[in-house]
Amino acid sequence: MAKMLKLWRLVLLAAFSLLLMAARMPDMKVVPWQQVEVPTQNILLDIAFTGTNPSHGWLVGDKATLLESQDGGLHWQVRKLTALEPEAYLSSISFAGAEGWVVGQPRILLHTLNEGSDWTSIRLSKQLPGEPILIQALGPGAAEMVTNVGAIYRTEDGGQTWHAQVEEPIGAIKNIARGPGGEYLAVSSRGSFYFLYTPESRSWKPYPRESSRRIQNMGFGPNGSAWKLNQGAEIAFTSDFTSGEWSKPLRPGRALSFGYLNAAYQNDHDLWVVGGGGTLIHSPDGGKTWEEAKKLSNIPANFYSIEFFGPDRGFILGQRGTLLRYVGYSNSPS
Protein backbone atom coordinates (compact mmCIF):
# COMPACT_ATOMS: atom_id res chain seq x y z
CA MET A 1 0.00 0.00 0.00
CA ALA A 2 2.82 2.39 0.90
CA LYS A 3 4.54 1.63 -2.40
CA MET A 4 1.30 2.36 -4.27
CA LEU A 5 0.89 5.73 -2.52
CA LYS A 6 4.49 6.60 -3.28
CA LEU A 7 3.95 5.71 -6.93
CA TRP A 8 0.85 7.91 -7.11
CA ARG A 9 2.78 10.79 -5.55
CA LEU A 10 5.44 10.45 -8.22
CA VAL A 11 2.80 10.38 -10.95
CA LEU A 12 1.07 13.48 -9.58
CA LEU A 13 4.41 15.27 -9.18
CA ALA A 14 5.33 14.48 -12.78
CA ALA A 15 1.94 15.66 -14.02
CA PHE A 16 2.23 18.87 -12.01
CA SER A 17 5.72 19.47 -13.41
CA LEU A 18 4.40 19.02 -16.94
CA LEU A 19 1.63 21.54 -16.26
CA LEU A 20 4.19 24.06 -15.01
CA MET A 21 6.34 23.51 -18.08
CA ALA A 22 3.32 23.96 -20.34
CA ALA A 23 2.45 27.18 -18.56
CA ARG A 24 5.79 28.69 -19.43
CA MET A 25 5.99 30.38 -22.79
CA PRO A 26 8.96 29.39 -24.95
CA ASP A 27 11.66 31.99 -25.29
CA MET A 28 12.02 33.66 -28.69
CA LYS A 29 15.17 32.38 -30.38
CA VAL A 30 15.50 35.65 -32.26
CA VAL A 31 14.11 38.93 -30.91
CA PRO A 32 13.49 41.27 -33.89
CA TRP A 33 13.55 44.43 -31.78
CA GLN A 34 16.43 46.77 -30.91
CA GLN A 35 16.53 49.50 -28.30
CA VAL A 36 17.05 53.03 -29.61
CA GLU A 37 18.80 55.70 -27.55
CA VAL A 38 16.75 58.85 -27.08
CA PRO A 39 17.80 62.08 -25.33
CA THR A 40 15.24 61.90 -22.52
CA GLN A 41 14.29 59.88 -19.45
CA ASN A 42 10.65 60.93 -19.67
CA ILE A 43 7.72 58.66 -20.51
CA LEU A 44 7.15 58.26 -24.26
CA LEU A 45 3.45 58.13 -25.13
CA ASP A 46 2.94 58.32 -28.90
CA ILE A 47 4.83 58.31 -32.19
CA ALA A 48 3.96 59.43 -35.73
CA PHE A 49 5.63 60.00 -39.09
CA THR A 50 4.69 62.64 -41.62
CA GLY A 51 2.72 61.64 -44.69
CA THR A 52 5.06 63.49 -47.03
CA ASN A 53 8.34 62.09 -45.69
CA PRO A 54 8.18 58.63 -44.06
CA SER A 55 11.63 59.17 -42.53
CA HIS A 56 10.49 62.29 -40.66
CA GLY A 57 9.11 61.23 -37.30
CA TRP A 58 7.95 62.70 -34.02
CA LEU A 59 7.69 61.39 -30.46
CA VAL A 60 5.61 62.94 -27.66
CA GLY A 61 5.45 62.24 -23.94
CA ASP A 62 5.09 63.67 -20.47
CA LYS A 63 6.95 66.75 -19.19
CA ALA A 64 6.58 68.50 -22.57
CA THR A 65 8.57 65.79 -24.37
CA LEU A 66 8.77 66.46 -28.10
CA LEU A 67 11.44 64.62 -30.11
CA GLU A 68 12.15 64.70 -33.84
CA SER A 69 13.81 62.17 -36.16
CA GLN A 70 14.94 62.66 -39.74
CA ASP A 71 16.12 59.09 -40.39
CA GLY A 72 13.11 56.89 -39.75
CA GLY A 73 13.50 56.69 -36.00
CA LEU A 74 17.18 55.74 -35.66
CA HIS A 75 18.21 59.02 -34.05
CA TRP A 76 16.19 61.63 -32.17
CA GLN A 77 16.65 65.25 -31.18
CA VAL A 78 14.84 67.33 -28.58
CA ARG A 79 12.50 70.06 -29.79
CA LYS A 80 11.57 72.80 -27.32
CA LEU A 81 8.38 74.82 -27.71
CA THR A 82 7.96 77.99 -25.67
CA ALA A 83 4.19 77.53 -25.78
CA LEU A 84 4.46 74.44 -23.58
CA GLU A 85 4.68 74.43 -19.80
CA PRO A 86 7.42 72.16 -18.37
CA GLU A 87 4.84 69.73 -16.97
CA ALA A 88 2.76 69.50 -20.15
CA TYR A 89 1.49 65.97 -20.82
CA LEU A 90 1.52 65.30 -24.58
CA SER A 91 -0.51 62.15 -25.17
CA SER A 92 -1.18 61.90 -28.92
CA ILE A 93 0.26 62.98 -32.28
CA SER A 94 -1.00 62.40 -35.83
CA PHE A 95 -0.11 63.50 -39.37
CA ALA A 96 -1.93 63.61 -42.71
CA GLY A 97 0.56 64.73 -45.32
CA ALA A 98 2.62 67.62 -43.96
CA GLU A 99 -0.16 68.64 -41.59
CA GLY A 100 0.15 67.44 -38.02
CA TRP A 101 -1.60 67.68 -34.67
CA VAL A 102 -0.62 67.15 -31.02
CA VAL A 103 -2.98 67.05 -28.05
CA GLY A 104 -2.37 66.83 -24.34
CA GLN A 105 -3.03 68.25 -20.91
CA PRO A 106 -3.85 70.81 -19.75
CA ARG A 107 -6.05 71.60 -22.79
CA ILE A 108 -3.17 71.45 -25.26
CA LEU A 109 -3.67 71.51 -29.03
CA LEU A 110 -0.73 72.05 -31.38
CA HIS A 111 -0.96 72.33 -35.16
CA THR A 112 1.60 72.34 -37.98
CA LEU A 113 1.32 72.70 -41.74
CA ASN A 114 4.97 72.00 -42.58
CA GLU A 115 5.91 68.65 -40.99
CA GLY A 116 6.61 70.31 -37.65
CA SER A 117 9.04 73.00 -38.73
CA ASP A 118 6.60 75.38 -37.05
CA TRP A 119 4.00 74.52 -34.42
CA THR A 120 1.05 76.77 -33.56
CA SER A 121 -0.82 76.53 -30.27
CA ILE A 122 -4.61 76.62 -30.70
CA ARG A 123 -6.70 77.73 -27.74
CA LEU A 124 -9.40 75.30 -26.67
CA SER A 125 -12.64 76.43 -25.08
CA LYS A 126 -12.97 76.18 -21.31
CA GLN A 127 -16.34 74.58 -22.00
CA LEU A 128 -14.65 71.54 -23.57
CA PRO A 129 -15.76 68.43 -21.64
CA GLY A 130 -12.61 66.85 -20.24
CA GLU A 131 -9.02 66.99 -21.47
CA PRO A 132 -7.81 65.96 -24.95
CA ILE A 133 -6.20 62.51 -25.01
CA LEU A 134 -6.37 61.43 -28.68
CA ILE A 135 -6.08 63.17 -32.05
CA GLN A 136 -6.44 61.74 -35.55
CA ALA A 137 -5.46 63.74 -38.64
CA LEU A 138 -8.00 63.15 -41.41
CA GLY A 139 -6.92 65.35 -44.32
CA PRO A 140 -6.36 69.00 -45.24
CA GLY A 141 -7.60 71.06 -42.29
CA ALA A 142 -9.50 68.08 -40.86
CA ALA A 143 -8.95 66.18 -37.61
CA GLU A 144 -10.87 64.35 -34.92
CA MET A 145 -10.17 64.86 -31.22
CA VAL A 146 -11.32 62.81 -28.21
CA THR A 147 -11.25 63.85 -24.55
CA ASN A 148 -10.82 61.75 -21.42
CA VAL A 149 -14.57 61.72 -20.80
CA GLY A 150 -15.44 60.43 -24.27
CA ALA A 151 -16.35 63.71 -25.97
CA ILE A 152 -15.56 63.53 -29.71
CA TYR A 153 -15.06 66.64 -31.84
CA ARG A 154 -14.17 67.20 -35.48
CA THR A 155 -12.71 70.19 -37.27
CA GLU A 156 -12.68 70.91 -41.01
CA ASP A 157 -11.02 74.33 -40.85
CA GLY A 158 -7.64 73.72 -39.28
CA GLY A 159 -8.83 73.73 -35.70
CA GLN A 160 -10.64 77.05 -35.64
CA THR A 161 -14.05 75.48 -35.00
CA TRP A 162 -14.96 72.07 -33.62
CA HIS A 163 -18.23 70.17 -33.96
CA ALA A 164 -19.46 67.49 -31.54
CA GLN A 165 -19.72 63.99 -33.01
CA VAL A 166 -21.34 62.34 -29.99
CA GLU A 167 -24.50 63.37 -28.16
CA GLU A 168 -23.27 62.72 -24.62
CA PRO A 169 -19.84 61.98 -23.11
CA ILE A 170 -19.51 58.80 -21.04
CA GLY A 171 -17.45 59.85 -18.04
CA ALA A 172 -13.83 59.15 -17.17
CA ILE A 173 -11.98 56.71 -19.42
CA LYS A 174 -8.44 55.40 -19.11
CA ASN A 175 -7.80 54.03 -22.60
CA ILE A 176 -9.27 54.54 -26.05
CA ALA A 177 -8.56 53.26 -29.56
CA ARG A 178 -9.77 54.42 -32.96
CA GLY A 179 -10.75 51.95 -35.68
CA PRO A 180 -10.16 52.28 -39.42
CA GLY A 181 -13.74 53.42 -40.04
CA GLY A 182 -13.85 56.04 -37.31
CA GLU A 183 -15.13 53.68 -34.61
CA TYR A 184 -13.87 53.91 -31.03
CA LEU A 185 -13.42 51.42 -28.21
CA ALA A 186 -13.05 53.08 -24.80
CA VAL A 187 -12.34 51.55 -21.38
CA SER A 188 -13.93 53.10 -18.30
CA SER A 189 -11.56 54.46 -15.68
CA ARG A 190 -12.26 51.56 -13.30
CA GLY A 191 -12.24 48.92 -16.03
CA SER A 192 -15.75 47.70 -15.19
CA PHE A 193 -17.19 48.64 -18.58
CA TYR A 194 -16.12 49.30 -22.12
CA PHE A 195 -17.90 51.47 -24.66
CA LEU A 196 -18.31 51.29 -28.43
CA TYR A 197 -18.88 54.31 -30.67
CA THR A 198 -19.72 54.14 -34.36
CA PRO A 199 -20.02 57.26 -36.56
CA GLU A 200 -23.55 56.42 -37.67
CA SER A 201 -24.82 56.04 -34.10
CA ARG A 202 -23.43 59.31 -32.69
CA SER A 203 -23.60 57.72 -29.25
CA TRP A 204 -21.66 55.38 -26.99
CA LYS A 205 -22.96 51.88 -26.26
CA PRO A 206 -21.82 50.39 -22.92
CA TYR A 207 -20.83 46.76 -22.36
CA PRO A 208 -20.05 45.25 -18.93
CA ARG A 209 -16.89 43.24 -18.46
CA GLU A 210 -17.38 39.49 -18.92
CA SER A 211 -14.41 38.43 -16.79
CA SER A 212 -13.98 38.75 -13.04
CA ARG A 213 -10.90 40.80 -13.85
CA ARG A 214 -11.16 44.46 -14.79
CA ILE A 215 -10.48 45.61 -18.34
CA GLN A 216 -7.09 47.24 -18.88
CA ASN A 217 -7.04 48.13 -22.59
CA MET A 218 -8.67 47.37 -25.94
CA GLY A 219 -7.89 47.77 -29.60
CA PHE A 220 -8.86 46.85 -33.13
CA GLY A 221 -7.55 43.95 -35.20
CA PRO A 222 -7.82 42.95 -38.86
CA ASN A 223 -11.11 42.34 -40.65
CA GLY A 224 -13.42 43.78 -38.01
CA SER A 225 -11.86 41.93 -35.08
CA ALA A 226 -10.69 43.32 -31.74
CA TRP A 227 -8.60 42.37 -28.71
CA LYS A 228 -9.14 43.03 -25.02
CA LEU A 229 -6.56 42.98 -22.21
CA ASN A 230 -7.77 42.35 -18.68
CA GLN A 231 -5.86 42.87 -15.48
CA GLY A 232 -3.99 39.76 -14.39
CA ALA A 233 -2.45 39.25 -17.85
CA GLU A 234 -5.65 38.03 -19.52
CA ILE A 235 -6.34 38.34 -23.26
CA ALA A 236 -9.67 37.91 -25.06
CA PHE A 237 -10.64 38.23 -28.72
CA THR A 238 -13.70 38.86 -30.86
CA SER A 239 -14.13 38.42 -34.60
CA ASP A 240 -16.72 41.23 -34.65
CA PHE A 241 -16.11 44.24 -32.41
CA THR A 242 -19.77 45.32 -32.75
CA SER A 243 -21.17 42.04 -31.39
CA GLY A 244 -20.23 42.37 -27.72
CA GLU A 245 -19.31 38.67 -27.72
CA TRP A 246 -15.79 37.66 -26.70
CA SER A 247 -13.77 34.48 -26.48
CA LYS A 248 -13.00 33.01 -23.09
CA PRO A 249 -10.04 34.97 -21.67
CA LEU A 250 -6.70 33.19 -21.84
CA ARG A 251 -3.52 33.76 -19.86
CA PRO A 252 -0.46 33.08 -21.99
CA GLY A 253 2.62 32.01 -20.08
CA ARG A 254 3.18 31.89 -16.36
CA ALA A 255 0.33 32.15 -13.92
CA LEU A 256 2.20 34.98 -12.23
CA SER A 257 3.45 37.72 -14.53
CA PHE A 258 3.43 41.42 -15.13
CA GLY A 259 0.20 42.82 -16.50
CA TYR A 260 -0.31 43.42 -20.21
CA LEU A 261 -0.79 47.07 -21.17
CA ASN A 262 -1.14 47.29 -24.96
CA ALA A 263 -1.14 45.23 -28.15
CA ALA A 264 -0.84 45.64 -31.91
CA TYR A 265 -1.17 43.47 -35.00
CA GLN A 266 1.84 43.46 -37.29
CA ASN A 267 -0.25 41.88 -40.05
CA ASP A 268 -3.36 39.69 -40.17
CA HIS A 269 -1.86 36.99 -37.93
CA ASP A 270 1.21 38.29 -36.03
CA LEU A 271 0.15 39.87 -32.73
CA TRP A 272 2.48 41.57 -30.24
CA VAL A 273 1.58 42.38 -26.63
CA VAL A 274 3.56 44.65 -24.30
CA GLY A 275 3.38 45.16 -20.57
CA GLY A 276 5.08 45.91 -17.30
CA GLY A 277 8.65 44.95 -16.45
CA GLY A 278 9.84 44.91 -20.07
CA THR A 279 7.22 42.32 -21.06
CA LEU A 280 6.91 41.51 -24.76
CA ILE A 281 5.10 38.43 -26.06
CA HIS A 282 4.30 37.41 -29.62
CA SER A 283 1.72 35.19 -31.28
CA PRO A 284 2.37 34.18 -34.91
CA ASP A 285 -1.15 32.80 -35.34
CA GLY A 286 -3.56 35.37 -33.94
CA GLY A 287 -3.42 34.22 -30.32
CA LYS A 288 -3.30 30.41 -30.56
CA THR A 289 0.35 29.98 -29.59
CA TRP A 290 2.75 32.35 -27.87
CA GLU A 291 6.43 33.05 -27.32
CA GLU A 292 8.20 35.54 -25.07
CA ALA A 293 11.11 37.92 -25.63
CA LYS A 294 12.66 37.15 -22.26
CA LYS A 295 15.88 39.07 -22.94
CA LEU A 296 13.90 42.33 -22.96
CA SER A 297 12.80 41.77 -19.36
CA ASN A 298 16.24 43.11 -18.43
CA ILE A 299 15.12 46.57 -19.58
CA PRO A 300 14.06 48.39 -16.38
CA ALA A 301 10.91 49.94 -17.80
CA ASN A 302 7.24 49.32 -18.43
CA PHE A 303 6.27 49.12 -22.09
CA TYR A 304 3.14 51.26 -22.53
CA SER A 305 2.53 51.34 -26.26
CA ILE A 306 3.28 49.44 -29.45
CA GLU A 307 2.48 50.61 -32.96
CA PHE A 308 3.17 49.38 -36.48
CA PHE A 309 3.36 51.60 -39.56
CA GLY A 310 3.27 48.63 -41.91
CA PRO A 311 4.44 45.04 -41.40
CA ASP A 312 8.15 45.90 -41.40
CA ARG A 313 8.05 49.07 -39.32
CA GLY A 314 7.12 49.11 -35.67
CA PHE A 315 7.98 50.84 -32.39
CA ILE A 316 7.54 50.13 -28.67
CA LEU A 317 7.31 53.08 -26.26
CA GLY A 318 7.74 53.08 -22.51
CA GLN A 319 8.89 54.80 -19.37
CA ARG A 320 12.39 56.19 -18.72
CA GLY A 321 12.75 57.20 -22.36
CA THR A 322 12.45 53.61 -23.56
CA LEU A 323 12.09 53.17 -27.33
CA LEU A 324 12.44 49.93 -29.29
CA ARG A 325 12.45 49.64 -33.08
CA TYR A 326 11.38 46.62 -35.10
CA VAL A 327 14.34 45.48 -37.21
CA GLY A 328 13.12 42.11 -38.47
CA TYR A 329 14.53 38.66 -37.85
CA SER A 330 17.36 38.84 -40.40
CA ASN A 331 18.75 42.08 -38.92
CA SER A 332 18.50 41.11 -35.26
CA PRO A 333 21.77 40.32 -33.45
CA SER A 334 20.03 37.91 -31.06
Curated annotation (Swiss-Prot):
Top-level taxonomic group: Bacteria
Pfam families referenced in this protein's UniProt entry, alphabetically: PSII_BNR
N-terminal signal peptide: 1-22
Subcellular location as annotated: Cellular thylakoid lumen
Any one Gene Ontology BP term: photosynthesis
Domain notes per entry: A 7-bladed beta-propeller torus, about 55 by 55 Angstroms, with a depth of about 25 Angstroms and a central pore.
Family the entry assigns: Belongs to the Ycf48 family.
UniProt function note: A factor required for optimal assembly of photosystem II (PSII), acting in the early stages of PSII assembly. Also plays a role in replacement of photodamaged D1 (psbA). Assists YidC in synthesis of chlorophyll-binding proteins.
Protein name as catalogued: Photosystem II assembly protein Ycf48
Gene: ycf48
